[in-house]
Each structure stands twice: as C-alpha cells, then as structure tokens.
Curated annotation (Swiss-Prot):
It comes from Sulfurihydrogenibium azorense (strain DSM 15241 / OCM 825 / Az-Fu1). NCBIfam families: hemL (TIGR00713), PRK00062.1 (NF000818). One of its GO terms (biological process) is protoporphyrinogen IX biosynthetic process. Homodimer. Pfam families: Aminotran_3 (PF00202). Its cofactor is pyridoxal 5'-phosphate. GO terms for cellular component: cytoplasm. This is Glutamate-1-semialdehyde 2,1-aminomutase.
C-alpha cells in the first residue's frame, strides 16, 4: 500500500502542529507507523490522500452512527450555513435540539450545550460540587472523561494508549480531590463512601467503558452505584459522551434502567460537528448561571451548524430506530472474531455492547482496567498495521472501541472478517 503523500504531509505537519496532530492518538505512535491523512469519507468508507480506500471502524471516534457524509445531515448543515455560522445569541435550533435530548433521555429535564465532551464533563463536575457544596469526586480507573484537570487521573483513551500515568500541570492538591477506584468493584465504592462519604460531591462513570476498550458493567453494578450515591447525598453522573444515542436512543441509561442525576453528552449529538452537552434534573440544572450561581459559558455553545447537524441525526435515529440492526452487526463481528481466534488458537477476548467492540489481545477476561492492561499491545499493533494494509481502518490503540454505523453493509462485515483471518495467519 502506497502512503507516500501521507508520510510527506505528516513530516510537514510536525513543523507546525505539536507531534504533527491535534489529538495524540492520531499520531499512530502506539502502533508503530505513520498516520494516514484522510481526504474524504462516504458511508462506511474513507479515502486517504494517496487514494487508498478503507472500511472505517473509527467513525471519528464514534459520532458518525449514520456513516460519513449522510446526505440529510450534510444538507441540514448547508441550509443553516447559508444564513450564518455563529451568532453568539439564542436561536430556535437550540430549543429544538434541547427538546430532542430531553424527550429522548428520561433522567434529563434541562440541558446546557457546550462545545466538547471535555467541556461537558468539566461543567458537570463543577455543577455537582456547587450543588452539593462538597469537594471530592469519584472516578474509575481507565475511564476517560476528557482532559479536564480533575478527571485526567488514571485515565483511559490516549492517556492509556501512550502509557502516561498522569500528567504534569495538574496540581497535586487538585488531584488529591479525585478518588480513583477499580471499575466493576462495588465493594471499593462502598469502602470509599464509608471513609469519605460526607465529602464526596459525585461519582462519574462511563456506563459502558469505552476508553480502556469496551468493558461492560457487571450485573446490578449501576443500581448499587445509584443506591450508594443516594444514601450519601452524592450525585451520580453518567458520562454518555460515547454511549449516548449509540447504545439506545435513550443511551446506556435506557439500556440498564438507571436514572442518574446528571448526564454528559457529545459525539453522536453533533452529527460529526464539535458539540457537547450536560443535563439532568431541573432542580440541579437551575444551579447553573444565569439562573443559579455556578458559572459556565461559551462563545460557540449551541452554534447553529452543530445544532442543525445534531438535530437531523437525532431525528433520523428516532425515525429509523436502528439499534437492533446495529446490535446484530456487532454480534456478527464479535462471533466472527471469536471463531477466527479459535481457528488459530489465538489468545484474544472480544468485548462488545451493541455497536461498540474491542478485541483485546489477552487470554484473561477483561472486566476492568487492570485486566485490560494484560493485553499484548505489540501484538495489537501488528494486527492494526496488517488490517490497515488490507484496507480496514481500526482505532490506533488497544484501549479504544471499534464503532459500527448504519452504513456498514453485510459485505463490509464479511470483508473485514476475511481480512482479519489473513492477519491472524500472519500473527
């Protein structure tokens, strides 16, 4: 496969962009090759600047649940752009988009739009602290909630990919307010609340972890979290930036039947444009300015382009209700990967929830970050490079999810497994 132009662009990019990229995992550092530069995408496919075609399972890290450049989403953006791209003032689209989120997600009575998932989680944490008048927060080892200071402790995603345990620039005094616990260990949560319960403002969790690779919650885990947080007067925050409108129209909380106090959103709700949101019970959300004392603002928050793209995507998801179809596609890939691994006696674990999948290169069942880290990252890197060479674009990290879209055809899935079989032969 020729990627000469991508290599030239990456070399040039490093003169102007830190590491040649605007987000660390894009540099392909963990998989031992140079990144490909994308020229265009349509449906389930992307094309790089050298003209190579790929079946895409990154989908911009999750937002493109209807595939690349969906005609109706693109048209919605075009129509709005003709009238202006940003006003820094209220628009009717913001109301329509807010109503769509509130109607879809049972626990959300009010919402505030921001520009990224990181902004959403940072704002939700500030709100939880302001509402409860407490300082400490609980997060889980390997869960990634953006790059806000309070949350970039024992994080997943690019932090895990690059093997960074924490990061310089976060004061120890602030980091000490974050209690980090193992995912799926309810006893650890109970113990933490026994020790610090009166000081804990909130628990924030990915209801299905995606940033250490896909890890599902154990049975009754979320209900126990809900019970414990209620008992101690702490807020439960579901970070549904990845899972919201992807695992079900009402998100992971619909799937598991749990009503958190606050929810953060991103990715799917923007239709591929920059967006984030946080929402929850009216009583809590009315602590946010201008109604309440907790300040949060943004020049481009609720901008018309993101609202138009997101609203059209949510409308289509409601009309199509593709979640059973997406689950079936996910199951087909999951079973296919497992069968191939069995053929070659390969030590892998395939974790999946709906249209999110991770193939872990380990013989140990993955239920938390500690078990995820037993994966052979070198073997994953070889698998990644082999699949890329054969036209299958996967996340460039062992600790990320593959995403499916409505645009992925049965032929795409079969071709993916065929190429995977060829790669497992080499491995």
């Amino acid at each position: 496969m020729n990627i000469l132009k991508s290599k030239e662009l990456f070399k040039e990019a490093q003169n102007y962009l830190v590491g040649g990229v605007n987000s660390p995992v894009r540099a392909f550092k963990a998989v031992g090759t140079d990144p490909i530069f994308i020229q265009r995408g349509k449906g389930s496919r992307i094309w790089d600047v050298d003209g190579n075609e790929y079946i895409d399972y990154v989908l911009s890290w999750g937002p493109l649940i209807l595939g690349h450049a969906h005609d109706q989403v693109v048209n919605a953006i075009k129509q709005v752009a003709n009238y202006g791209t940003s006003f820094g003032a209220p628009t009717e689209l913001e109301i329509e988009m807010a109503k769509a989120v509130v109607d879809a997600v049972k626990s959300v009575e009010m919402v505030r739009f921001v520009n990224s998932g990181t902004e959403a989680t940072m704002s939700a944490i500030r709100l939880a602290r302001g509402y409860t008048k407490r300082k400490k927060i609980v997060k889980f080892d390997g869960c990634y909630h953006g790059h806000g200071d309070s949350l970039l402790v024992s994080a997943g995603s690019g932090v895990a990919t690059l093997g960074i345990p924490g990061t310089p620039g976060i004061p120890e005094e602030l980091a000490n307010l974050t209690i980090v616990l193992p995912y799926n260990d309810i006893e650890a949560v109970e113990e933490a609340f026994k020790r610090y319960g009166e000081d804990i403002a909130c628990v924030i969790i990915e209801p299905v972890a995606g940033n250490m690779g896909v890890v599902a919650p154990s049975k009754e885990y979320h209900q126990r979290l809900r019970d414990i947080t209620r008992k101690y007067g702490a807020l439960l925050i579901f970070d549904e930036v990845m899972t919201g409108f992807r695992l079900a129209y009402g998100g992971a909380q619909e799937l598991y039947g749990i009503d958190p106090d606050l929810t953060t959103f991103g990715k799917v709700i923007g239709g591929g444009l920059p967006v984030g949101a946080y929402g929850g019970k009216r009583e809590i959300m009315e602590y946010v300015a201008p109604v309440g004392p907790v300040y949060q603002a943004g020049t481009l928050s609720g901008n018309p382009l993101a609202m138009a793209a997101g609203l059209r995507q949510l409308q289509l998801l409601k009309e199509l209700n593709p979640y059973r179809e997406l689950d079936e596609k996910g199951r087909f890939l999951e079973e296919g990967f497992k069968q191939i691994a069995q053929e070659f006696s390969a030590a892998i674990q395939v974790n999946r929830v709906g249209s999110m999948i991770t193939v872990f290169f380990t013989d140990i069942p993955v239920k938390d970050f500690a078990t995820a880290k037993t994966s052979d990252t070198n073997k994953f890197a070889k698998f990644f490079r082999c699949m890329l060479e054969k036209g299958i674009y996967l996340p460039a990290s062992q600790f990320e999810a593959f995403f499916l879209s409505t645009a992925h055809s049965q032929k795409d899935l079969e071709e993916t497994l065929e190429k995977a079989r060829e790669c497992f032969k080499i491995l």
